[in-house]
Curated annotation (Swiss-Prot):
This is SPbeta prophage-derived membrane protein YosA. It comes from the Bacteria. Belongs to the SscA family. Pfam families: YjcZ_2. The chain crosses the membrane at residues 19-39. Its main location: membrane. The gene is yosA. Keywords: Membrane, Transmembrane, Transmembrane helix. It is found in: Membrane.
Length: 39
């Protein structure tokens, strides 16, 4: 819920593009690092 409210707030604020891309990149990096430690 916190992510969704921040997502819609960024969208209406006009800063949707950069913040969303930043979140996606951080999420992908987190998955890669996690997979590296698991395997």
């Amino acid at each position: 819920m916190g992510f969704y409210s921040g997502y819609s707030g960024g969208y209406s604020g006009g800063g949707y593009g950069s913040s969303f891309v930043l979140i996606v990149v951080l999420f992908i990096l987190l998955i890669i690092v996690g997979a590296t430690f698991l395997y």
